[in-house]
Amino acid sequence: MSEHNDVDHNATDTAAPVTAAAPANHAEGAIKRGGQTTAVDLQCASRYSLWLAYRDEPPHPATGAFDSLTFETDAHTIALGPCQVLEDADAPDGHYRLVPMASIHDFEKLFQQSRADVLDLAARNLPLILQYRNNIDPAFRTFVGDVAYDISVYKELFDRLDAEYAGEPEPVREVIQQGLIRNTGQEFIDCLNAHVADMERIIDNFEGEQHSQHGYYLRKQLWGELLTAPFMARTNLKPRGYIGDSEMMQMCYRNTYEGDSTFGKLLHHHPVSSAAAQAVRNRRPLVAAMAGDYADRMGASADNRMRLLSVACGPALELHDLLNSRERCQQVEYSLLDQDDLALGEAAAALGAVEKRLQTPVKVNYIQESVRTLLATRALRERWGEFHFIYSMGLFDYLTPPVAKAVLSKLHALLLPGGEMAIGNFHVTNPTRRYMDYWLDWPLYYRTEEDFLALTEDFGDATAWIEYDDTGVQMLLRIRKATT
Amino acid sequence: MTHELDLTLRPDWQEVEQLNQQAMTFLTDTGMAHAEVDTYTMVICELAENSIKYGDSSQPICLNVKVRDKSVCVQVKNKVRSEAHGHLRELDQTLQWIRGVQDPYQAYLERIRELSREPIANARSCLGLIRIMYEGHSDVDFVLDDDTLNVSALSRSR
């Protein structure tokens, strides 16, 4: 039904890999025990073991513990500490298996790719990581201890109750869980809110990187509990490699109790019912109303379609709000841009649902590209055309000012005369800011009105102003290009 | 008050030593503390080295440093060849991932671990940029505008 165009990957050439010379797959070395050094030949036996053959008279005994092994490969001099030499039925004739007990190298990588990778590398950084707690403010340390204690008490309680009614039929379990969420669950939420308020007071005088250090410390102490809440697990683990992915947005939109346990559901619901998540929900009808209003003003029709571009579109659920009639569907041509093919898939599903509900196709183009590299496309205008309305809701919160300015400038150049933009950014006064930083590991670039308007200071032919959602957290930079 | 330094550099490694001196002099003249001078000199030189490494060797590099009361912003612009675009996609993903890790030191350690596990032919370190984020206390970001690469480092706090 859809008039969907293929995804435009905006392909560019990739750099040709450098070809490395094939490394030798054997080495000569020396193994030591006590004061005795013996020359050896070595080959890779498995990822973490070597085949060893004594070149001269073997030591006595030939197997057992040795103090060290040194050998040279094409690119590295490797010094292993204590190691064990073992008899092995699979060994080639005259060979033993050698297994290091410290500095446990990946020998496949070493011999096949000339790359030194050590299994226990992470352990070498332990002292530095352990020292981190020395930087933690004593009051904050006490606070985290109290939070961890209270949360563990509630978790244990809810887990025990879940186990008690686990054998009940599903409808019974559901009603019991709803009751727990409504009653004892509310006590837990009140307790969490009190702790978050305490935290705000304790960190009030912190500066710069103190926040990231203390947030890291808090998450480290609460890690197991945070991972029981799907939203917190996702913001902390970032499974798609970046923050604010489309599934996180969907969770905010759903604003429900999700998780495998009553405790996890309560902890999940806490952030998705916060002011910041409400601001995410508010922007959906807000941007749809702005775009709809523009379509009415321009007299959009099937013959005079309003061209819309959504940048970093995510799941694009606002399509449900904007495309609310067959007429509206026929008045628009949408371009949806996102770096994430999964997000574009979700947007396509949202559009498919609209088309099915209204029994009419929507003209849409999908563009898979990152905003940082999309500007590399020469002649964007010729490629994608110009637009009446461009919006971007969850992108600029992640862009530094120089990049935000460059991206906005390019988007502005894609506006038709009289065209409008709506660009979202969270305001510096977001009351959930530190909660997001500390508990969710979700840092943003917050802006003031002045910061936001400064991004437009070079636009000679535009009017710019600021609007807000009802929470005041979601700030919208509105730009109208001059008609001539 | 804003102190500003504008320089045009040849894409030549020998320029870095001179740049080091110029940056130190400029930053010292802004009244910055000695430790900060060292930090932001490193940031400036790392960004310039990155441009020399990945930029078009026949085109100059434009460097701009703005020092304000509460921030330091370093921007480096130069032309890049189309062969570098593949690397920029990797850089984009790496920077977004690092930005998602609030503690740049953790990102630094993790990146070193990742690099040691990559085949040598694919190794693209980005370590200089991560160093800027960790030791330089700055957020690195970039944008490719036509064939001009604009890399910026913005101090998280002063």
Language-model regions, residue ranges each:
Chain A
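Core SAM-dependent methyltransferase catalytic element
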Residues: G460-T484
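Structured alpha-helical
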Residues: M1-Y149
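A short glycine-rich, Lys/Arg-flanked "PGG" loop and its adjoining helix->strand segment in the class I
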Residues: K405-P417
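Conserved Class I S-adenosyl-L-methionine
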Residues: R434-L455
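A short acidic, Gly/Pro-enriched loop at the edge of an enzyme's catalytic core
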Residues: T377-I390
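N-terminal accessory segments
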Residues: V99-H270, A275, M290
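Conserved SAM-binding loop of SAM-dependent methyltransferases across substrates and taxa
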Residues: P315-C329
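Conserved beta-strand signature within the Rossmann-like core of class I S-adenosyl-L-methionine
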Residues: G418-N425
